[in-house]
Structures are given as structure tokens and as C-alpha cells.
Curated annotation (Swiss-Prot):
Entry protein name: Chromosomal replication initiator protein DnaA
Binding annotation for ATP: 170, 172-174
Assembly: Oligomerizes as a right-handed, spiral filament on DNA at oriC.
GO CC terms, sorted: cytoplasm; plasma membrane
Amino acid sequence: MSLSLWQQCLARLQDELPATEFSMWIRPLQAELSGNTLALYAPNRFVLDWVREKYINNINGLLNDFCGAEVPLLRFEVGNKPVSQNDSPPQRVVTHTPVAPAPQNTSVRPSWDNTAVQPELSYRSNVNPKHTFDNFVEGKSNQLARAAARQVADNPGGAYNPLFLYGGTGLGKTHLLHAVGNSIMARKANAKVVYMHSERFVQDMVKALQNNAIEEFKRYYRSVDALLIDDIQFFANKERSQEEFFHTFNALLEGNQQIILTSDRYPKEINGVEDRLKSRFGWGLTVAIEPPELETRVAILMKKADENEIQLPGEVAFFIAKRLRSNVRELEGALNRVIANANFTGRAITIDFVREALRDLLALQEKLVTIDNIQKTVAEYYKIKVADLLSKRRSRSVARPRQMAMALAKELTNHSLPEIGDAFGGRDHTTVLHACRKIEQLREESHDIKEDFSNLIRTLSS
């Protein structure tokens, strides 16, 4: 056996696992083969436990394949593998002029901002203390994003830099940004963590140019420990801002300072942003946040009700969650309306009461999302005819969109499987069930299918 054993395992795992899972959990592992023991070193306890729980069978299976009777014992440890005399430490190439250190006086606002009249901290974190990992409701739709954010919070500037989170409005991207910021500052009280919307970066740069203070602007942004920027897509067509952010990005990365970005779309799909920036957005880890599935929507409602000290019956939470599906913000807004109505009227929160309190919202939702609407939207998306979806044709170009439309009908409407099958050319309910399971499987395996599903959900729910 040789040290190339782990490289062989990596190659196979990269083929077998979804790219996001491989990048998040397997790539950070370091391996050391000593005698008949293969030690795998994880960057932290969270990764170690996850790999041991989820992937140990995959790894042991590959070791059996490659080693036969001489399978090494597998050992997991937290930390870096010991550096042997033959190992040469990696060299970092600095390709820019080193940035001047941050000013020691942190009791004033950045000097490019001439609106300052009262002293305040230079590093205005803008991190909302209310958004933490503890009150972020985890589900299948956001599990990877939360896990990635948690790892970044535990090890900023490490393996996942930058971290790029993308997904539709109101799905929890901003919550995770604040959660990371709060966690970093809890571990290190003097950490320089800055959260902002991308438009704030643009405004600060314009102010710096107007006040002839661009060097101070650069020094400020390049000396933070963690830069958290929301809605990076608003950099589109702002060439000077992109130019400045490009150099800021490079400086932070070379200084092992953490960058987290969010967007409403996949990096390569952001129009009006330079290719060199889009390429850098994908250097670390890119993770999607999907619209929450039913169980997560119910959990969000129950947790929100608990925070408001409201007893929300389970059947009521299920009723709301089944009908409002697009995002977390919509769910919370609906629950706030229900709670307010209950407080004003003194009535108990029942399904009938909720149906009355959310009458306009539920009517709009039911009007927007119908099977007919789903069929038209899917047909347009895949550039086929609605008649193709209803036909007996089984070619891939028609069968896959048909399965997608059936899965969306199950997700977005209250129709039963037989009713959905009926609407698709009189198909049996087992055909609909197979379609739903197939799309669920493909969303795990195929980035394209996952993107298609998210895009269609977003279109139909907007």
C-alpha cells in the first residue's frame, strides 16, 4: 500500500458523490498511511462526526476494493496531519502590494465618510444579534448551507473561502450571514466582522471618491477579519465597484480573511458581472438554499409561534404550511397576521380562524398555482408544448419535463395523486408517485435538475 491509496479513494468519491457534498465534506480531509492504519484528519469535530456518520461505508467499501485482504484500519482525528521531514510546507505567492495595516484608532468612523460628527467604532459590524444558528430552522432544503456556514464560523478563512450562498428571496441567506458574524464575534470579541448589502459597498466607494479618500476605503475593507456581503448581484453593470471589489477580494483571500457572499442566483448566471469575479466566487464553496419543504415549513411556524409564546396547534401549522410554500418570509408574515388577529379579537387559533384571517392570501395563492399554470410554465421553460406533457410520448425530451411538472403539482397544489394523474392525460397515480420520487432523486444527483426545480418553484410562487 502507498500514500496514493487515499488519492484513489478521492478520485472515486468525487465520481460517486454530488460535487457540493464532495467539496464540503471529503476534500478538506487529510490522510496519513502508517503501517496498517489510515488516519483521516478533519478540520473540526463537526466535519469528523458528519463524515463518520454519512460516508464511512463509502470509504470502507473503496478500501476493500483497492486493498483486498490488506485493508487498513481506519482512524479519524481532528486537526492537521503531522508534517513529515519529506513534506515541504506550501508556499503562498503574493501577487499584489501588501495592504497597509488597519489604523490602530478604532474610535472614529472611516475617514472617507465625512458625515461623522460623533465618535463611533470604525468597524461597524451591522450584524443583527437576533439571527443566530440556534434560531435557524434546519431542514433538507437548507441543511448543506447551514452546515457550510457553521464550519466557516468555526474556522474562518479556512477551506470554504469564499462561501457563496444562493437561492430565492426569503429563504434564510441573510439569517446565515448574521449567524456566522455573531458566532465569530462570540469566539473573538475584537474580531473585525462587517456585514453589508452590496449597495452599501458601492455607496461607500462613491463617498470615498468624492472625498478623495480611496486609500482609506481600501485599507478599511482589506483589514477586516470577515466580510459578509448580501445580494452580490447588485454589483451588475457597476464597473468601478466591480474593479475595486476584485482587488479587495484578492487581498482578503491572500490574507486568509473570510468572505461570504449571497445572491439570488448561481454565480455564473449573474448577468452584468465580470467573468473574473464570477470565477472567483466559485473558488471556495457554492451552496444553494432551496424553498423549504413541508416539514421544514411546519417547524418554522412552530418555532416562530414558540418565540411569540403562542400555542399553535399542529394541524393549524400544517394547514398554513401546506398552502404557503414559496419562502420563510411569507410564512412568518402570515403567522404574524394570524397572531395579530387572534390578539385583537380574542379568538382561538383554529383552521377556520386561519382560513378567515388569511383569506386574501390563500385565495391569491390558489389562483396563482394551478395544474394548468404549472403545465404552461413547465412547457415554456423546456420549450415544448403542453400537449406533449399530456401525450403518451416517452422520449427523454418530453418524459423529464412531464415528471418535473407532476412533481411540482404535488409540491405546489393540494390535489391528490389520482387528480394530478388525471390532469396529465389520465395517468395512474403510481405514475405520478414514480415521477415525484424520480425528480427528488435527480435533484440530489444533478445540479441541472436541481436548478430547474428551483427556478420553476420561484417562477410559480412569485
